[in-house]
């Protein structure tokens, strides 16, 4: 069986070399375990093997188009995720909850501990707005005084280094209702956990909803949501903590926005394989991708 693999969820033009290195590490681990991992990852529809008649489930129902019928230089996530030759790929819990779980197997979770707002397999999303010279949360922290609590000390430290509100230690949601009410909300996709479903669920948990926003604007990508807020075509967005870290490193317009709150911690992007992957290979994938 010839496998394909992809790592598209955290790849920007500036990070392609990093993604290639990440795949090289995976590939070597897999090959040492006897898995015939592909040399390179898929980045375009044209690089996926064709599936004449479309990708079908066990009942014969078409669940995704033949990659050969798609625009060759684009990458269609729903087709990639359902491709019968898929060895490994990232996806999002949103699509999984909305039906993708019937067609794939989850084999691992990445570690988010290296990012503000992450802890092991859990991540959270910073709530992002345009920079304000005197964010209300900072004034509240100053009034409480330094040393009043660990959180206060962290907030004051954040004030010294910039304008971002730090992620709560307990991982609970920190939703600044007064700041976001009536604002225009940008999001990457309706099935995105970090960009849409997480803020929706955290608002519902406190008796609110996305109706708190005056408008919802679908951007297609976390980076585009950040840019929309920076440029003023939207007022607020949420992106997962690793994407925000990437924006701080690579997106110049990230300097025009700030973190004003956080969604609660929840499971980050899962790693999946096809239902057609042999069971012994699935077991080895799970073993390799499990935390030490």
Where on the chain are the PLM-derived regions?
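N-terminal hydrophobic or amphipathic helices and topogenic motifs
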Residues: 1-105, 109-122, 135-174, 178
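A ligand-binding cleft/hinge motif common to bilobed small-molecule-binding domains
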Residues: 91-101, 205, 230-231, 235-255
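Short coil/turn segments
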Residues: 93, 118-119, 130-135, 188-196
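Periplasmic-binding protein-like
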Residues: 108-113, 123-124, 251-287, 291-292
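A short secondary-structure junction signal
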Residues: 138-141, 196-201, 228-230, 249-250, ...
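Ligand/cofactor pocket segment of small-molecule handling proteins
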Residues: 181-241
């Amino acid at each position: 069986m010839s496998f394909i693999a992809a790592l598209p969820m955290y790849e920007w033009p500036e990070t392609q070399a990093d993604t290639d290195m990440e795949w090289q590490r995976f590939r070597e681990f897999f090959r040492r375990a006897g898995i015939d991992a592909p040399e390179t990852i898929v980045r375009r529809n044209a690089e996926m093997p064709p599936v004449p008649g479309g990708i079908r489930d066990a009942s014969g129902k078409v669940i995704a188009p033949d990659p050969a019928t798609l625009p060759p230089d684009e990458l269609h996530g729903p087709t990639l995720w359902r491709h019968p030759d898929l060895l490994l790929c990232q996806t999002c819990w949103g699509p999984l909850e909305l039906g993708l779980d019937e067609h794939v197997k989850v084999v691992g979770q990445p570690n988010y501990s290296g990012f503000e707002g992450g802890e092991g397999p859990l991540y959270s999303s910073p709530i992002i707005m345009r920079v304000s010279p005197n964010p209300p949360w900072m004034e509240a922290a100053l009034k409480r005084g330094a040393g009043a609590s660990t959180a206060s000390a962290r907030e004051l430290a954040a004030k010294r280094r910039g304008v971002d509100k730090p992620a709560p230690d307990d991982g609970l949601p920190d939703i600044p209702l007064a700041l976001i009410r009536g604002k225009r909300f940008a999001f990457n996709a309706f099935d995105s956990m970090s960009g849409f479903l997480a803020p929706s669920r955290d608002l519902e948990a406190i008796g609110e909803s996305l109706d708190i926003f005056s408008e919802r604007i679908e951007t297609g990508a976390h980076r585009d949501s950040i840019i929309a807020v920076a440029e003023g075509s939207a007022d607020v967005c949420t992106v997962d903590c690793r994407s925000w870290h990437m924006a701080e490193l690579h997106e110049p317009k990230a300097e025009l926005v700030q973190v004003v709150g956080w969604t609660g911690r929840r499971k980050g992007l899962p790693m999946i394989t096809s239902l057609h992957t042999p069971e012994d290979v699935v077991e080895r994938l799970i073993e390799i991708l499990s935390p030490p």
